[in-house]
Amino acid sequence: MTYENISPSEAKSRMDTNPEAVIVDVRRPDEFVTGHIPGAINVPLADIQDGNIPLCLADKNAVYLIYCRSGVRSVTAAVALEKMGYTHLANFGGILDWPYEIEH
């Protein structure tokens, strides 16, 4: 398995220590605009499943920190990206469990 499940606090630590890490929100755009983690990019799960991967996810060796609303879609996204050859994936669940800053 190339992806790992980590806690929100571990994700925050990785964001703070690795500015190169890409924070990926796999919720729908209408969910993303209601509030998201600062610096996150919105790549809906449906796009990933359809193979519509944006340029911001072009580097399969980059570090990706993935989340959704409750943690279900983020696991699905991590598995799909893993099958596409991505090597550094971390799922930290849902924004519902995120105790830190949220950007609106």
Over which residues does each language-model region extend?
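Rhodanese-like catalytic fold shared by cysteine-dependent sulfurtransferases
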Residues: M1-A21, P29-V63, V72-H104
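Short, surface-exposed ligand- or partner-binding patches at beta-edge/loop junctions that are enriched
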Residues: Y67
